[in-house]
């Protein structure tokens, strides 16, 4: 299967989440996790924003080089020469530029003037940096006219010969079928020298699914983050996206098998977020890592063939079935005679219906004794 590049934007997207700021030490720790997990590219910040951003990114880049890390360090800026000049100060070789062709932007600027700005910026970078990798993000694929999107893609791919064309659903309003249609069209224009990236926001809860669909439609770079942290509702989740793609046979350097390190990574980002904003991102309902992913209530699920398995929890209410009750009794080491199992299940259901809640362990013990 195709090789997929993992572009972790936890740092820069995280700094756009509800009052969150990452210190240099926190960025370094995040980069260490990314390296340990096989991330290909880390977006360490936004250099034109402030002198401190340039300083932090430069230090992150040099530290990664000093340690002989494989991870590549990048920064984001507008597709303007003045922004790119600040990026050059960091010493980076990975340049992420963004521009917009939405109706609102075109009410202020012509397509030709935006093209000229893009050309000037790309030529400037190439005059200052030997063999840079240049990515351009077109904001955004959901709000830009399809014919204009194709025209922009052809200009960037054929005329400017950029390395990566990123297709972001910045508004987070697209569904997988819409992403598929647009990414497939643009990917068909890419040729062999320009890779297509996919970057999806989560306003309608579709970010991870849309990112996966972008790959299925022809993209080869996922732009994701730890816990899906990012602007507004965030972006695609790095672990869930990566695991899903690997399970489908795609080739990723991302080591989703290192679940313990991923958990540490997520717990670290969550702790920083909670400390600085009072918001917890890692909770019982977090996919894969949340406790709820290992709980069962309905009888069919109690067979143990669904979900993540590992350390499981069982809750008994009117929806429980024989297999789930069996697993519950085994888990809590409650002895019973198998011939009374059906009666035990019926009594548990009756008790739950009567109380309008799940039954407690003590109540289950009483039911088992009474049934025997």
Model-identified regions with their sequence ranges:
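N-terminal small/glycine-rich loop or linker at the start of catalytic domains
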Residues: 1-19, 96-107, 127-141, 186-195
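Catalytic alpha/beta core domains of metabolic enzymes, predominantly
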Residues: 170-289
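Active-site beta->alpha loop and helix N-cap motifs at the rims of alpha/beta catalytic domains
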Residues: 41-48, 67-152
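A mid-to-C-terminal "edge-of-domain" accessory segment
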Residues: 3-4, 10, 251-372
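Conserved, mostly hydrophobic/aromatic
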Residues: 14, 34, 95, 136, ...
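Alpha-helix-loop-beta-strand connector modules within alpha/beta enzyme cores
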Residues: 51-78, 116-131, 180-198, 243-249
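N-terminal capping/small domains of soluble enzymes
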Residues: 1-79, 331
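Glycine-rich, proline-tolerant flexible connector loops at the mouths of alpha/beta enzymes
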Residues: 39-63, 97-110, 139-141, 166-177, ...
């Amino acid at each position: 299967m195709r090789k997929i590049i993992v572009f972790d934007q936890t740092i820069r997207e995280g700094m756009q989440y509800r009052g969150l700021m990452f210190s240099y030490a926190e960025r370094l720790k995040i980069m260490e996790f990314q390296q340990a997990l096989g991330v290909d590219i880390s977006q360490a910040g936004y250099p034109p924003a402030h002198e401190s951003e340039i300083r932090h990114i430069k230090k992150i880049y040099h530290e990664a080089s000093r340690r002989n890390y494989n991870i590549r360090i990048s920064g984001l800026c507008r597709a303007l020469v003045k922004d790119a000049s600040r990026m050059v100060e960091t010493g980076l070789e990975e340049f992420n530029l963004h521009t917009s062709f939405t109706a609102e932007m075109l009410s202020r600027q012509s397509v030709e003037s935006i093209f000229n700005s893009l050309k000037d910026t790309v030529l400037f970078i190439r005059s200052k940096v030997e063999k840079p990798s240049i990515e351009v993000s077109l904001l955004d694929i959901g709000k830009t006219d399809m014919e204009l999107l194709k025209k922009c893609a052809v200009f960037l791919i054929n005329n400017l010969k950029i390395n990566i064309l990123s297709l972001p659903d910045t508004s987070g309003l697209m569904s997988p079928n819409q992403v598929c249609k647009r990414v497939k069209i643009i990917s068909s224009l890419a040729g062999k020298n320009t890779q297509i990236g996919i970057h999806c926001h989560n306003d309608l809860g579709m970010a991870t699914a849309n990112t996966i669909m972008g790959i299925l439609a022809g993209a080869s770079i996922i732009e994701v983050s730890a816990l899906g942290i990012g602007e507004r509702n965030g972006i695609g989740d790095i672990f869930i996206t990566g695991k899903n793609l690997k399970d489908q046979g795609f080739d990723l350097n991302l080591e989703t098998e290192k679940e313990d390190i991923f958990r540490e990574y997520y717990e670290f980002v969550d702790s920083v977020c909670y400390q600085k904003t009072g918001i917890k991102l890692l909770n019982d309902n977090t996919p894969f890592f949340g406790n709820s992913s290992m709980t069962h209530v309905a009888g069919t699920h109690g067979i143990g063939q669904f979900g993540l398995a590992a350390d499981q929890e069982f809750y008994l209410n009117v929806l429980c079935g024989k297999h789930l009750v069996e697993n519950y009794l085994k888990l809590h080491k409650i002895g019973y005679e198998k011939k009374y199992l059906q009666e035990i299940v019926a009594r548990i259901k009756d008790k739950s219906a009567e109380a309008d809640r799940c039954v407690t362990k003590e109540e289950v013990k009483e039911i088992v004794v009474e049934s025997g």
